[in-house]
Amino acid sequence: MCDAFVGTWKLVSSENFDDYMKEVGVGFATRKVAGMAKPNLIITVNGDMITIRSESTFKNTEIAFKLGQEFDEVTADDRKVKSTITLDGGALVQVQKWDGKTTTINRKIVDDKLVVECIMKGVTATRIYERA
């Protein structure tokens, strides 16, 4: 199910992330620090629980969830959101909702790379990770 995602991933490229963070409402100083961070993602599966841990010089975050079940999340920029993650066509699709706003984060494996698309209104950031 999600086995292809399991492992440690390092960020190798990031496109349009500052514009995405701006659209989300992240402040200037936080955007500058977060934009320079090169996070590692550690993804594990234990039964029906999936854990995604992000480790960087900016901040460490971790979410643990079951597919299709809403959970509370505090994001790296300290937004308190309701998240739901589903598996759709081999992609992990995360929808975050807060204060009447919605953003979508799609994670998929393409050519053994983890491609993460962050979408807010008309702005899309693409971040590519390789296995560490």
Curated annotation (Swiss-Prot):
Oligomer status and interactors: Monomer. Homodimer. Interacts with PPARG.
Gene: FABP4
InterPro entries named in the record: Calycin (IPR012674), Fatty_acid-bd (IPR000463), ILBP (IPR031259), Lipocln_cytosolic_FA-bd_dom (IPR000566)
Tissue specificity remark: Adipose tissue.
UniProt comment concerning the protein's domains: Forms a beta-barrel structure that accommodates the hydrophobic ligand in its interior.
Locations listed in the record: Cytoplasm; Nucleus
Native source species: Sus scrofa
Family named by the database record: Belongs to the calycin superfamily. Fatty-acid binding protein (FABP) family.
Coiled-coil boundaries: none
Intervals of motif Nuclear localization signal: 22-32
Protein name per the record: Fatty acid-binding protein, adipocyte
The protein's role, per its UniProt record: Lipid transport protein in adipocytes. Binds both long chain fatty acids and retinoic acid. Delivers long-chain fatty acids and retinoic acid to their cognate receptors in the nucleus. Involved in the regulation of intramuscular fat accretion.
